[in-house]
Amino acid sequence: MNTTVDEGEALAEALRDVDTESVDVLVAPPFTHIDRVARALEGTEVFLGAQNVSEDTYGAHTGEIAAEMLADLSVDYVIVGHSECRGRGEEDATVAKKAVRALEVGLLPIICFGESEEVYGSAERVDFLKKQVKASPTDMKDLDKITLAYEPIWAIGTGKTADATDADEVIGSVRASLDPAIRGKVRILYGGSVKSSNVAGFVAKENIDGVLVGGASLKADEFKAIVREATHG
């Protein structure tokens, strides 16, 4: 939960000239900011996302946001299974349901997966991550619309960053566990204390298709620098 509506709109306005020629650029503001941010980005190639969605359809689900509501606001992508949501008890099955709901209304889900520091240091690390991904709706026909995002929980908002080579190897193992028919269709991102000074090292790796940026995206100049470094190194 960051920025007021006015601040979010100003940030979006500052991103109107961000370089989108070689990379896909997405912003995912809080629900309350989406309409104003969408207007600020109108006419640009910047995609609009949301930070979460309900696994339910319309009905008596007070406080929830239905996928249809996001589609009405011209949202393109929606993040599901973020580590902060999983930390509040969200389970793999719920994440999968949210991804399916998003796809049903034409939204593109970004499905997050990641491990705690305890799991990171154990022999079960890769199997744990594969289990999370296996719960995703990877048997559906429109797999090219699904993006996965590896975000080690111990690197989210802590200033700690995974080693790029290690992240690449882990993502490569997860990709290899997918059905051969879909491996090349699914984009897998890295997220975890990404900034302009380290992004080039991640996107240069074979198995990392992009990055999911957190706190560094709250400053327009830094966000633009991340895009620039990801594009040109």
Question: Where are each of the predicted segments found?
Answer:
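Active-site loop-to-helix "anion-binding N-cap" substructures in soluble metabolic enzymes
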Residues: 1-233
